Amino acid sequence: MRARDLGIVIGRGRPGRRNTIADVAGVRVGHATIIRGEGRLVVGEGPVRTGVTVVVPHDGDVFTEPVYAGCHRLNGNGELTGLEWIREAGLLTGPIGITNTHSVGVVHDGIIRHAVRRLPFGASFWALPVAGETWDGLLNDIDGFHVTMDHVDEAMAAASASEGDVVEGNVGGGTGMVCHEFKGGIG
């Protein structure tokens, strides 16, 4: 349920047809969701409630066709890699990855690996990907290292295959998210 569904209007703008980020032409979102295990937490075994979400800002090759970007910090608690490049160049040069706090590094690396695998042999490439964190440590074995670079590839494939529809809630990087002691999610 959304605020607008309850008659609450925020701001002067109107949402697009889907009322999602994908209402912006070319924006695609994909998720890789990891859910396994039940019961008491055993580090390294679970239960696992986590994942990866990627936001691809346009239909072209975002690695070679960047988009303008900016940033603002509202809450200094949280990690988002790639911000200094955005501040310096004003450009986003790859998809945005979202995952749990302890998996930001592997998602960062997975975005680079995804780009490098698409390059012709011998091509030179550098990247400062944007990878951000969500807190899922209450519902997930956050210390178990369950997110892998393959999950980034899965989320990228899902974004490529999406027709603009965005799955929201307990998926991808929002699977185990908790916000102010309430169950949160993506979207």
Regions found by a protein language model. Give the residues of each.
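Alpha/propeptide regions of enzymes that mature by internal proteolysis
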Residues: 1-186
